Amino acid sequence: MTVVGAALLGLMTGLHTATWGAYKDSPFEGFKWTSYLRSVVLGMGIAVGIAVTTTWTVDLHPVVIVGLVYTFERLATEWWKTIVRRDDQSAYTIPMRLGYRGLPVDNHAIRYTVGVAVIVGLIIACAAATTMEHALPSEPRWATILIGGVGGWLTAAGGAWKDAPIEGFSPWKFMRSPVIATAWAVPLSFLTNDWAILALCAGGFSVASIETYKTFFTGGRPPGKFATKPAIHRVPRLRRVLAVQHTGCWVALAIVVSATALGPLPV
């Protein structure tokens, strides 16, 4: 796959992640071009960065690249919102900034220390998975699939830390990410057997699947972060456009899967 091909995959992935945030949040805070374009630019930038700095676009299936872009874009965006961004937390029912027992942590030193620790921890976890994989004489399929679900467990832990002090702990909500990530790991394990890459990729597709469900299949329920806030913007036409775009991105991904079944992508 060329750099152009990677950029196109990144564009598709970035457009996809941009749709669910804009669809859910626009009735409460209006449509923000900066937030929308952030995901698009990040998706393309991450995909191009992968193509330029690694051999993954040669070694890995395009669908795996898409899953990795989902993960890295979401990690970058959520890390920025949790650690770096300075905005009025009273606008949210659930604070978006790093919190403790439901209250935002305003101390910059603490937030940045936690932010760095999260990055280092993820790097160590990926390195440990790779080391453990290479140390085994063989890689049982069941072990590969279970490792592939680790991204879902990490997502669940982060979500519970943020949401549970406000909403209460929901076992169903907590288990949703691990179960779906593990389910994604089953087909993805036929495309890559690298444990770290599989866990990252399955975690990304788990987020995309859950966000699709929460955005379009919950009967218009407001996102948790705005649960007690009024919807002050009427944007039905915009939301219809975003829904079509979101569906189109899933269709585009299906086309990529079908095309690669016939041979390498032409770009």
Task: Identify the residue ranges that each predicted region occupies.
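Final/C-terminal transmembrane alpha-helix of multipass membrane proteins
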Residues: 110-126, 240-264
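Membrane-helix interface and helix-disruption motif detector
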Residues: 1-5, 23-33, 53-65, 129-146, ...
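N-terminal signal-anchor/start-transfer transmembrane helix
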Residues: 5-25, 150-159
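Generic multipass alpha-helical transmembrane bundles of integral membrane proteins
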Residues: 95-168
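A cytosolic-side transmembrane-helix exit/cap motif
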Residues: 81-95, 164-169, 215-230
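A generic, lipid-embedded transmembrane alpha helix
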Residues: 37-55, 176-191
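Membrane-interface segments at loop-to-transmembrane junctions
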Residues: 29-40, 92-108, 168-179, 226-242
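Alpha-helical transmembrane segments and their membrane-interface exit regions
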Residues: 68-78, 151-155, 202-213
